[in-house]
């Protein structure tokens, strides 16, 4: 997903469930937008938050790599609701028989306000690195991920 892993965590919670570096959560548990998202933000700085699945439709055959599930730009500090939503949240929904998928949250510090409100494509085949390069975001400052598989 990215060439340089972030050194800090983005804290993500779904009610009383916490995303913790690859723990497994069910699609039902993450159906709705997280109830809390926070990171070590600089006051007055602007950030981009993305949630992406690099394993679409499966880890063995990721022909849709990446499928982005959420994209928000121009977040003031860590006040996610202050940002501009480019793609509404969609929870995990791995197809049957595709095994565990990783759902990755990345936070980028922006050099300034992003005025281009096009994310550069559809949800499948999104490339977070291309988006970051286009907007001069550099490496992510925080990240985290969970895993999920199809629910019967």
Curated annotation (Swiss-Prot):
It holds the Pfam family PBP. It comes from the Eukaryota. InterPro entries: PEBP, PEBP-like_sf, PEBP_euk, Phosphatidylethanolamine-bd_CS. PROSITE patterns: PBP. Belongs to the phosphatidylethanolamine-binding protein family. This is Protein D1. It comes from Onchocerca volvulus. The lineage of its organism: Eukaryota, Metazoa, Ecdysozoa, Nematoda, Chromadorea.
